[in-house]
Amino acid sequence: MPRLFLAFLLLLTARVSADKLEPRILFLGDSITYGGNWTVYVESAIRAQKGLSRATIVNMGLSSETTSGLSEPGHAGGSFPRPDLHERLGRVLAQFKPTLVVACYGINDGIYQPLDAVRQLAFQDGIIRLRLACIRSGAQVILVTPPLYAPDNRSKDVINYDGVMEAYGAWLVAQRSAGWQVIDIHPHLHQAVDAAKKADPAFVYAKDNLHPGEQGHLFMAQAVWQSLAPMMKWKADVSFAEGAKLKLLRDSSIVLRDAWLMQAGHKRPGVKGGLPLAQAEARSDDFIAEYLKK
């Protein structure tokens, strides 16, 4: 059977399966996703949809992670190599059983080096493996292009690592012609940061050039949501949660994230352990119940 036809059948099966099951939405990514701010904004928009207010939504991002399996020499002071998503992905999919996976990788996959064909191919292979594993598990998968690198200090990005991320993102976008669902956040983020700096020259997207601040996470969420909503046929014109409501969702997200990372297991040292899964789910249910009252 031709590989393209097989991929089409797998994708069709995943979408039919997802339509029949209760929504179980999984976010995967590196430290920017682990931080959880952009995912919580998106979660609030998902919970505003009819029938999704109590959907199971879990962020299992993991700091330092790649899809490529690459790690630069001396990473983390030589204490450990970057974790490889594929070491844990099978367990995550088997245990959580997502109907939808939203994955954002790339920023670590280039290991902060100039654009290189070998590293780029490793990223592409890792993404292909990620996508196929999700589809084979019965999940719909939506891939998000990498975010920005050093937009506040472009003159210091001497190897043009943001350009590496643009190249990685361009490859992802090109896969739309093969039926992939891809959200391209890179152009939106540049526009949003440029507009913010024009309004306030002191605005900073990422103090360390990598991890966005709160406003940067909001920009990411906006960029994701404007494409995710039509892809999923959700109502796009909804407001993200704010204030006390947003905090309740963050508390719920953190307790589930920590429990699920511990439950599924990983090889990244220094990650805070969580509650036993049943206890975490009960606490999350309490947070969501309070969230829905406000």
Write out the residue ranges for each language-model feature:
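Sec-dependent N-terminal signal peptides
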Residues: 4-13
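The substrate-binding groove and active-site-proximal loops of carbohydrate-active enzymes
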Residues: 78-79, 111-122, 155-163, 211
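Conserved catalytic region of serine esterases and O-acyltransferases that act on ester linkages
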Residues: 51, 178, 198-294
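A short helix->loop->beta-strand "cap" motif at the edges of active sites that frequently abuts
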Residues: 135-140, 180
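Extracytoplasmic/secreted envelope proteins and their assembly/folding machinery
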Residues: 39, 43, 86, 90, ...
